[in-house]
Amino acid sequence: MSKIKTLRLEATIHKLLSQAISTEINNSLIKTSVITAIKLSDDKSVAKIYIDCLIPNNIAKTLQAYKDATGVFRHVLSKHLTIRRIPQLVFYYDDSISKGAKIDQILAEIKQEKKENHE
């Protein structure tokens, strides 16, 4: 499969999983998290799904909730995708949003300090 088709498939999987979370999943831990990225392996047998938790204290529980809901997610994918094999879903915590927020906070503090020093 070409790179463009792989990217398109990743986007489709992202869309389908996001829809499944909003319509078919009732777990509050899953509903308070966001899928940030999906990366397919070269042979399309494994999909690495990166999630960010809106409640940072529940990272381990949220990852476990996603693992427990893997069957539901794979079923949704099998209904909508026309690929031969549905990839194995592996969930990872993505802390890039949290790191970005920390960087923004640091930059805001530096900007505030510069303002105070110039006054």
UniProtKB/Swiss-Prot annotation:
Gene name in the database record: rbfA
Q: Which family does it belong to?
A: Belongs to the RbfA family.
Alphabetical UniProt keywords? Cytoplasm, Ribosome biogenesis
* A Pfam family of this chain: RBFA
Q: Mainly localized where?
A: cytoplasm
Classification via PANTHER family? RIBOSOME-BINDING FACTOR A, CHLOROPLASTIC-RELATED
Where is it located?
Cytoplasm
From which organism does this entry originate? Mycoplasmoides gallisepticum (strain R(low / passage 15 / clone 2)) (Mycoplasma gallisepticum)
User: What's its job?
Assistant: One of several proteins that assist in the late maturation steps of the functional core of the 30S ribosomal subunit. Associates with free 30S ribosomal subunits (but not with 30S subunits that are part of 70S ribosomes or polysomes). Required for efficient processing of 16S rRNA. May interact with the 5'-terminal helix region of 16S rRNA.
Do the record's keywords include Cytoplasm? Answer: yes
Q: Which protein, by its recorded name, is this?
A: Ribosome-binding factor A
Taxonomy of origin reads:
Bacteria, Bacillati, Mycoplasmatota, Mycoplasmoidales, Mycoplasmoidaceae
Q: Does the keyword Aminoacyl-tRNA synthetase apply?
A: no
